[in-house]
Amino acid sequence: METALASKHYQYVWVETPSNPLLNITDIAATAEVAHKYGTKVAVDNTFASPALQHPLADGADVVVYSTTKYIGGHSDVVGGAVVVNDEETREKVAFLQNAAGAVPSPFDSWLDIRGLKTLDLRVKRHSANALKVAEWLESQPSDVIERVWYPGLESHPGHEIAARQMHGGFGGIVSVQLAAGAEAAKHFVDHTQIFTLAESLGGVESLIEVPAAMTHASVAGTTLQVPANLVRISVGIENADDLIADLKQALDRI
């Protein structure tokens, strides 16, 4: 990153941490330190962590963006987004663009997001606790069943130490897993869960499951952004963790 910034001026460095769907972790403070040295601002997509777990502005970021459709709304019934800034000049620019483009949420959608904020902390802590249990169980499965588990709460995750430092109270509710039997096994697996619903969204109280390569990330196949075909992304809800694990087990047993 520093090499790129030193050779050309950029207005922003964009960061998503944890990233979708491989949950890669970026050190926000270190990124901000380098970017600011070259007069570049840092914008962080904090959707996966939510403001309950991670505070990018406190770590040096200049702009934070959210899909409020996900954890902030939390009930799979609103579509929205938010931009959070820490200086008046940037706020005025964003407000002007919002007004000019008409990107203003309805009163009801705003009410739904405000309602979600009331329980955000409780929900995200339960999401995180359940996700850690699910990730640990998946990681304990034989290597001929589970190739790899991606979850920043696991010590095996390459970004675990950074995540533990900059995330507070949990590691989020998203777990990604690669099945050893390949892409068709991944599709068969998600077709046979009973509690997990096959759907593309995430962050609601109910558990969802999908195959990114065939669904959310199908459009980036063949590019540097493509994801493994055997990858399954799991949005772990707030149901009983033992029930969720039992559901995953019976679906794996059917492969």
Q: What does each model-identified segment do?
A:
Residues 1-144, 150, 156:
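Conserved PLP-enzyme active-site core in the AAT-like
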Residues 6, 191, 207-255:
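PLP-dependent enzyme catalytic core of the Aspartate aminotransferase-like
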Residues 74-75, 107-109, 167-170, 224-229:
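Short, flexible turn/loop "capping" segments at secondary-structure junctions
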Residues 78-80, 170-174, 229-233:
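Short, solvent-exposed beta-strand edge segments and adjacent coil->beta transition regions
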Residues 88-90, 156, 180-182, 214, ...:
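Short, glycine-/Ser/Thr-/acidic-enriched flexible segments
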Residues 101-102, 193-201, 251-255:
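A common structural junction motif
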Residues 113-122, 172-180, 233-237:
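Short, well-ordered beta-strand elements within core beta-sheets of diverse protein domains
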Residues 132-194, 198-203, 217-223:
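Conserved small-domain helix->loop->beta segment predominantly found in fold-type I
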